[in-house]
């Protein structure tokens, strides 16, 4: 298996992910489990404990227009949500040009 897509309720992917899975397949998580880099903010926002905080720093925000090279090398990809994608792609050219 090369790639695993997860589309689960908040908290479920984080409770299932482990080094064994990541050593065998790239994981693309469609939930928000690995989008927010601050565990305390994640837990406050979703009202649940994050079950895999050790993988948060490794997860790459999967917006290919901005993080293409990082995504290619990543084992764990946090698929961006629709509102952040729209907002980010709208302002990114302005930020990039300063």
Map each language-model feature to its residues.
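N-terminal Rossmann-like NAD(P) cofactor-binding subdomain of oxidoreductases
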Residues: 1-98
């Amino acid at each position: 298996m090369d790639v695993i897509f997860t589309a689960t309720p908040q908290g479920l992917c984080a409770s299932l992910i482990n080094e064994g899975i990541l050593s065998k397949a790239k994981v693309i998580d469609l939930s928000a489990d690995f989008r927010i880099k601050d565990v305390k903010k994640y837990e406050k926002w979703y009202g649940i404990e994050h079950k895999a905080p050790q993988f948060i720093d490794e997860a790459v925000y999967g917006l290919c227009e901005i993080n293409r090279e990082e995504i290619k090398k990543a084992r764990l990809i946090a698929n961006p949500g629709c509102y952040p994608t729209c907002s980010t792609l709208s302002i990114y050219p302005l930020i990039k040009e300063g």
